[in-house]
Regions:
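Conserved phosphate-binding/catalytic region of the ribokinase-like
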Residues: 63-67, 100, 127-222
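Glycine-rich phosphate/pyrophosphate-binding beta-alpha loops
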Residues: 22, 46-50, 214, 219-220
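Conserved beta-alpha-beta core of the PfkB/ribokinase-like small-molecule kinase fold
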Residues: 41-137, 144, 152-155, 160
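Conserved N-terminal subdomain of the carbohydrate kinase-like
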Residues: 1-46
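Alpha-helix termination/capping residues and helix-transition junctions
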Residues: 33-36, 109, 140, 200
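Short gly/ser/thr-rich secondary-structure transition/capping motifs
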Residues: 20-29, 94-99, 128, 172-174
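Acidic, amphipathic alpha-helical patches
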Residues: 32, 105, 179
Length: 222
């Protein structure tokens, strides 16, 4: 359950109530090897690494995917209150430093072919509030392609080494739209990104899909 407020184009206070919710009841026994074997990609969310039971399920799914040749992706999706480092009323908060969260994320980053997050989400994954330093820290533990979302500025991709500037990555511009509701922006972005990535499109085209889907999501209510 989410209680969402909309103050203006930049403030969306919300309260998460996620006590004993269905997705956090996921366990290893729920992971069907046959289902994973039929998948082209397994995408995990960072939230499900926050609890030992769901983490075990995620790790099993990733192991099966990698053994079967499927691609693996991580949406860092860092929500401090869902990791227990912020209160229920801090649902709008996107970043709280936590060595515990950073260590947990870094212990799994090597399992992914693609890692996606905002600058703040890479800060928690990399253990630094300097975006480039955070990306470099992630690169030391993972060879994944890194996709950094930059809101209205679009997104930038780092397939290999991290350059001296964010602007030196493979960039995709955002779409100028009126923002109504930011909830669902990340899900929309991932959907567009997967459409291009899984079909072997080039990064400019893939980022155009991703940014367009994210823009559609935030430009309407509901």
């Amino acid at each position: 359950l989410v209680l969402l407020g909309i103050r203006d184009q930049s403030q969306f206070p919300l309260i998460f109530y996620r006590e004993n919710c269905a997705d956090m009841a996921l366990c290893e026994d729920d992971i069907d090897p046959a289902f994973i074997a039929d998948a082209a990609c397994v995408c995990a969310t960072g939230t499900h690494l926050s609890h030992p039971r769901t983490e075990a399920a995620v790790l099993k799914a990733l192991r099966l995917a990698r053994e079967g040749g499927a691609r693996t992706a991580l949406d860092i999706d860092y929500r401090p209150n869902l990791w227990g480092v912020a209160g229920h009323g801090d649902g709008e908060s996107r970043f709280v430093e936590s060595q515990k969260v950073t260590a947990k994320l870094q212990s799994t980053l090597h399992l992914f072919d693609l890692i996606v997050g905002t600058e703040e989400e890479f800060h928690i994954a990399g253990g630094s509030t300097d975006t480039l330093e955070a990306l470099k820290a992630v690169r030391t533990v993972s060879n994944a392609t890194l996709v950094c979302k930059r809101g209205p500025m679009g997104a930038v991709v780092f397939p290999d080494e991290i350059p001296a500037s964010l602007d030196d990555g493979e960039s995709g511009e955002g779409f100028p739209i009126e923002v109504f509701n930011v909830l669902g922006a990340g899900d929309g972005f991932m959907a567009g990104l997967f459409r291009g990535w899984l079909r072997g499109e080039d990064w400019p085209t893939t980022l155009k899909y991703a940014n367009a889907c994210g823009a559609f999501a935030v430009s309407r209510h509901g």
